[in-house]
């Protein structure tokens, strides 16, 4: 948006504006597409998708796979055959680095609603006022979800220092009562997770790093997240920090139990310190054939999670509930 605003302020030619990454525009003629024709990936047209569910599904399959690749192409969809109009979508900007993401959160945000809402209650704002975003992106690849289309498949994480600085700033606000309602992101427990070998990620066409099996190249360590949780618990003014974002339990359990001791420790500390009363997870369905279509793990993993949850609450004597979400 900033780059587009700069170009408009400079009265730049449309040809210059059309090459800005991450924008979409309508082209009335082929020569209005500001790109080498050989580098354009044409998707099934709007008319084809409207007339055929298979074409619509194929359109989304291509878009999802190519948009999540390391070097996505310019994508074009013929929108109006009669008028010759084509929708053109440019590739996104590169993934934000930790330093770039930290710089965003260093900006002088007021954490207040616009002055026009003075004296009015905004329920949506109250729900997230004291939540803290740890990272962007999600590699879950659920077939019904568009998070990867919005934020990408790879994780871009803030530094521990950036997170703790923001929390210390929140703790000085008069409205803060000591409760952080979320330490999360699109998926709460993907903080700092990435491929061990980036070159393998660059060559990969999978839309999910977790389905049908967890990728062997994926580093699923919860070490950085555990360090962050422990640090936050000791920040002056913070009485409780709960996790409001969803977690992917297939990152630390399988049908046999915990994948490793680190995953077990993560779940223990999550339940003991970071659940306000109900831990919400999303198995989405109970039948494995349906879950397979949804790119979700077997319901057997939820049963394992429930067993371990009940065991942990019994061990600590806590009265917590596990709430499963289902798509109806």
Identify the residue ranges that each predicted region occupies:
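Conserved SAM/AdoMet-binding glycine-rich loop
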Residues: 169-328
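N-terminal pre-triad scaffold of radical SAM enzymes
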Residues: 118-146, 177-179
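N-terminal [4Fe-4S]-dependent radical SAM core
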Residues: 57-131
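Hydrophobic alpha-helical scaffolding
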Residues: 90-94, 124, 128-135, 149, ...
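Glycine-rich beta-alpha loop elements in corrinoid/cobalamin-binding modules
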Residues: 1-82
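Two-component system phosphotransfer/interaction surface
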Residues: 2-13, 98-105, 168
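Cysteine-centered iron-sulfur cluster-binding motifs in ferredoxin-type domains/subunits
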Residues: 130-143, 154, 160-162, 166, ...
């Amino acid at each position: 948006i900033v780059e587009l605003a700069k170009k408009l302020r400079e009265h730049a030619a449309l040809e210059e504006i059309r090459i800005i990454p991450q924008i979409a525009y309508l082209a009335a003629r082929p020569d209005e597409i500001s790109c080498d024709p050989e580098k354009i990936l044409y998707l099934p047209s709007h008319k084809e998708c409207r007339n055929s569910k298979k074409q619509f599904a194929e359109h989304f399959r291509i878009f999802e796979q190519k948009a999540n690749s390391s070097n996505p192409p310019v994508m074009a969809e013929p929108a109006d055959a009669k008028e010759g109009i084509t929708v053109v979508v440019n590739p996104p900007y590169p993934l934000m680095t930790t330093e770039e993401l930290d710089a965003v959160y260093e900006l002088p945000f007021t954490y207040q609603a616009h002055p026009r809402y003075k004296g009015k209650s905004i329920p949506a704002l109250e729900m997230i006022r004291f939540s803290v975003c740890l990272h962007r992106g999600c590699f879950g690849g659920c077939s019904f979800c568009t998070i990867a289309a919005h934020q990408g498949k790879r994780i871009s994480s803030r530094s521990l220092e950036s997170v703790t600085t923001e929390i210390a700033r929140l703790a000085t606000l008069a409205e803060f009562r000591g409760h952080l309602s979320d330490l999360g992101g699109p998926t709460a427990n993907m903080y700092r997770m990435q491929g061990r070998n980036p070159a393998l990620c660059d060559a990969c066409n999978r839309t999910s790093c977790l389905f049908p099996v967890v990728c062997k190249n994926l580093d699923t360590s919860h070490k950085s997240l555990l360090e962050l949780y422990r640090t936050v618990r000791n920040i002056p003014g913070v009485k409780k920090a709960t996790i409001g974002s969803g977690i992917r339990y297939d990152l630390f359990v399988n049908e046999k139990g915990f994948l490793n001791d680190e995953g077990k420790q993560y779940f223990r500390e999550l339940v003991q310190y970071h659940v306000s009363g109900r831990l919400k997870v999303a198995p989405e369905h109970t039948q494995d054939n349906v879950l397979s279509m949804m790119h979700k793990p077997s319901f057997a993993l939820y049963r394992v999670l429930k067993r371990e949850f009940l065991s942990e609450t019994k061990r600590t004597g806590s009265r917590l509930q596990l709430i499963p979400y289902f798509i109806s």
